[in-house]
Curated annotation (Swiss-Prot):
Classification lineage: Eukaryota, Viridiplantae, Streptophyta, Embryophyta, Tracheophyta
Record field: transmembrane: 21-41
Role this protein plays: May act as a bridging protein that binds pectin and other cell wall polysaccharides. Probably involved in maintaining esterification of pectins. May be involved in the specific O-acetylation of cell wall polymers.
Position of sequence motif GDS motif: 248-250
Main location: membrane
Alphabetical keyword list: Membrane, Signal-anchor, Transmembrane, Transmembrane helix
Other known facts: Contains 2 motifs that are conserved in esterases, but it is unlikely that this protein belongs to the catalytically active pectin esterases.
InterPro entries documented for this protein: TBL, TBL_C, TBL_N
UniProt organism field: Arabidopsis thaliana (Mouse-ear cress)
Protein name according to UniProt: Protein trichome birefringence-like 18
């Protein structure tokens, strides 16, 4: 076996040496060239983002898209401004433009529903998940109104509040709170169905088995300002030593419970209620939240009157509910709401004369002067004038406008349904509800007539919280068939296509109804600011 001789080894060693020297020389030269190139590049492009763009393909931070998966929503942190209004559409919603009066004649449901003549059923088609902000622009001169739904796939869009907006900030004093858009807020609600013990079971949608939760995350953004998230501590501070009362029907109860749920997260109140009035007392701030049931807000009785027999509800439309008038000296802020009970059977009386009725008019020979929507408008004017001129009440009165229902395809008892609605209605796809529109119009007219008839100093204490149009888009916010925790309840359509019994009037909690109390807080803040200046 032969191994290499020393001579051969020395030759190989001599041959390898110059290669090492050349390799080192080349490496040093290359490194020097790299530094020279980098120095020249730095001098030529002083903006570091430009250098990053050359090496990494990133020109500006604004071009970086960071996708966040939120259920079925994909959120792009930053987007090109040209994409924001890619799907803008116009929608005119002037409720007074030749709208026919629609008077409900069907049997109203127990406790909650307002039957009405329904428009063509709406079928909401699923949009591609890579969607964008869908906007209805406001043209002030042409009278068009804006209602905009900002999809989370494009958030934050022009209608979404920036992430760094303080939750305790306040909207601008002159900003219109009621024209704006719904946007998806990944932050979610401020409470859950498990953290609020006063939540009525019918509105406990998650506790009743509703499978989706996205409806809890949509928040309202006014077009010209921010509406801050509800700040319970700020509310209790503003209302220290004072009482807020909700007066109305079961939808007023819905709003009152929402307020309690929001406040319960910072302090547990004491129940001081009675059979006549619900009252919850927050000791640390001496704040009272109260509720009075008043279906029509005016005087009602059941005794025989003229040719109207005993047992039929009679309403004296020109007299306020005496229970309200007795209680309001104790209140500092009152939120009034009504309307849905005007679909129920009742007799209307003005100046001690029967002038009309709902689902009751036996004497066909006499003309009916007042129908149910007219009666609603008169009742609003009556209660507001009475409260504004009450000698012992000087509080802030907020009229929350008519809350829309979303029974599609029929009434509550004739196959109407809101099953399967998981997102707000998109602009341009809203089916107008004639009964809701005319009820809203009559309510606003009654409010304006009351304001016109009171002294100037009293006008400032009357506020219209105009939620009707914005909440027309929230067909996703109702319990639907998830009205009870019964594990055997029917939640899907039967073989014949008929939907199960459901509630498409009240609102899930947490849910859209919490926005009403964000607005209430803002109106109270504005009132306090106005009073102090």
């Amino acid at each position: 076996m032969a191994f290499g001789s020393p001579r051969n080894n020395s030759i190989l060693a001599a041959a390898g040496f110059p290669r090492k020297v050349s390799t080192v020389a080349i490496a040093i030269g290359g490194l020097a060239s790299f530094f020279v190139f980098g120095l020249l590049l730095r001098l030529s492009y002083p903006n570091s983002s430009s250098v990053g763009g050359i090496f990494y393909g990133i020109g500006n931070p604004e071009q970086v898209h960071v996708p966040l998966s939120l259920s079925n929503h994909t959120v792009n942190i930053l987007q090109k401004s040209s994409d924001i209004n890619a799907f803008d559409k116009n929608l005119t919603s002037d409720s007074s433009s030749g709208l026919p009066v629609v008077v409900s004649k069907s049997i109203p449901p127990p406790d909650f529903s307002s039957d009405r003549k329904l428009e063509t059923p709406l079928t909401q088609e699923k949009e591609d998940l890579v969607s964008s902000d869908i906007t209805e622009k406001t043209d002030v001169q042409s009278g068009e109104r804006e209602t905009n739904v900002s999809k989370a796939e494009d958030t934050p869009s022009a209608s979404s509040p920036p992430d760094d907006v303080s939750e305790t900030a306040s909207a601008e004093p002159e900003c219109d709170l009621y024209q704006g858009s719904w946007f998806y807020d990944p932050g979610g609600p401020l409470y859950t169905n498990n953290s609020c013990p006063v939540l009525t079971q019918m509105q406990n949608c998650q506790g009743n088995g509703r499978p989706d939760k996205g409806y809890e995350n949509w928040r309202w953004k006014p077009s010209q300002c921010e509406l801050p998230r509800f700040d319970a501590r700020k509310f209790l501070e503003l209302m220290k030593g004072k009482t807020l009362a909700f007066i109305g029907d079961s939808v007023a109860r819905n709003q009152m419970e929402s307020m309690l749920c929001l406040l319960w997260q910072v302090e547990t109140p004491v129940n001081r209620g009675s059979r006549k009035m619900q009252r919850w007392y927050f000791k640390q701030s001496s704040v009272m939240i109260a509720r009075i049931w008043s279906s029509w807000l005016v005087h009602q009785f059941n005794e025989k009157f003229d040719y109207a027999p005993e047992g039929v509800t009679k309403l004296k439309l020109d007299l306020p509910d005496e229970r309200i008038m007795e209680a309001i000296p104790k209140f500092d802020v009152v939120v009034l709401s009504s309307g849905h009970w005007f679909a129920k059977q009742s007799v209307y009386i003005l100046k001690e004369e029967i002038v009309g009725g709902q689902l009751w008019w036996p004497d066909k020979s006499k003309p009916m002067k007042v129908n149910n929507v007219d009666a609603f408008g008169i009742s609003v004017e009556t209660i507001l004038k009475s409260m504004a001129t009450h000698p012992n009440y000087s509080g802030l009165t907020i009229v929350r406008t008519f809350s829309p229902d979303h029974y599609e395809g029929g009434a509550w008892n004739t196959g109407g349904s809101c099953t399967g609605k998981e997102e707000p209605i998109l602009p341009g796809k809203l089916v107008k509800n004639g009964f809701t529109e005319i009820m809203h119009e009559k309510q606003a007219t009654g409010y304006n007539q009351a304001v016109d008839k009171v002294a100037e100093n009293l006008k400032l204490k009357l506020k219209l919280m105009d939620i009707t149009e914005a909440f027309g888009y929230r067909h996703d916010g109702h319990p639907g068939p998830f009205r009870s925790p019964d594990p055997n309840k029917i939640t899907k359509r039967g073989p014949d296509g008929r939907p199960p019994p459901q509630d498409c009037l009240h609102w899930c909690m947490p849910g859209p109804v919490d926005t009403w109390n964000e607005m209430v807080l803002e109106l109270i803040r504005r009132d306090r600011k106005s009073s102090s200046t």
